[in-house]
Amino acid sequence: MELLFTATLLHFIRLFEKAHEENVKKADLEKKKAANETEMKHVVHNSWLNNLNIRASTLIDQRRAFNTMIMLQKVEMPLPDMMAAVLGMDESVLDVDQIENLIRFCPTKEEMKLLKNYTGDKATLGKCEQYFLELMKVPGVESKLRVFSFKIHFGTQIKELNKGLNTVNSACEEIRTSQKLKEIMKIILCLGNILNQGTARGSAVGFKLDSLLNLSEKCSANTNMTLMHYLCKVLASKASDLLDFHKDLENLESASKIHLKSLAEEMVAITKGLQKLNQELTASESDGPISEVFRKLLKDFISVAETQVATVSSLYSSVGGNTDALVHYFGEDPNDYPFEQVTATLLSFVRLFTTAAHQENVKQAELEKKKAAKEAEMEKTKKRVSLTNKKASGVGEEESCLI
């Protein structure tokens, strides 16, 4: 038995040593591979720099030229084809990331001046210089690239802005028209006046919106029940149809995540972007044939974009009026109590109310369960007593018969 155990132990030790050796070999191979890749990059970089010097392509800063080369490798197409895609604003050829990279690597004024003043054979220049020269063939190429980028982003920007504006408008409408919320507010005011009876606050005609959050406080020092739980208990017994008032406020949570300042910034960005498109359209009229396709496509796009921007601008204007009306609805001043604070307070109230209502529901269910169990026990006791009485009555009859 001991020999078998020793043999098994030795077997597992050998397996462990073998696995460890394989892991060490694998780790060494990965280190060598990483080192080789790093060395290869240095070799390629140095080789490229040497080649750069041989070909006299030292007009552009070496680091910038190298980074430009890396960027162009990701585009993977001849420079004339790339520029045709830019002027044709062809999203099937160039994606937004590639466009942003092209913008980053547009030649500066100094670099363009350097290339224009170069009197040598331009064919001997490096790929970075060739790329810059290709871009320089198109007047205002950086502006055109930015137009292309705006066009790609425009659809998503308009969609998201529309969504945000509609959410805010819907939330304002839902809150102001919810009869259930209005009834709950009345009941809260009534309960507050009852609890504060005999004090200066016992005849209030309204309350601040922030007071809704005070309902999570205890009714008194002698009880663990909060005002919110008491409210839910009253509603459950007197107006249970109001307990699901939060269903009226479908867009409240989404609206609470939206900041009007962000919507304003998006609106400004889109409006300014459209202005730049019109400026570029005017500027490109003097470009000549090279920008003919670009001008036609841009003109068509502006026509569609202007209609969409006009629609969203109208929607944006309505949001300002609706949010102010909502704040006034609760007797607050938009300058002191902004829309974001209204939705945040209401959402907190809804969550506190929902939690309290659930807890009261569970508590009530437990009480009813205990009540039912108690009634069942009483019924059993009643039956036992009845049966005992019957038996006792039967014994008495037999005894009387014997007598």
UniProtKB/Swiss-Prot annotation:
Pfam families named among the record's database cross-references: FH2
Signal peptide: none
Region of interest called Disordered, as start-end residue ranges on this chain: 373-403
InterPro entries from the UniProt entry: FH2_Formin, FH2_Formin_sf, Formin_homology_domain
Domain FH2: 1-380
Source organism superkingdom: Eukaryota
Record-annotated disulphide pairs: none
Family (UniProt): Belongs to the formin-like family. Class-II subfamily.
PANTHER family, per the entry: FORMIN-J (PTHR45733), FORMIN-LIKE PROTEIN 15A-RELATED (PTHR45733:SF10)
Protein name per Swiss-Prot or TrEMBL: Formin-like protein 21b
Species assigned in the record: Arabidopsis thaliana
Gene this chain is encoded by: FH21B
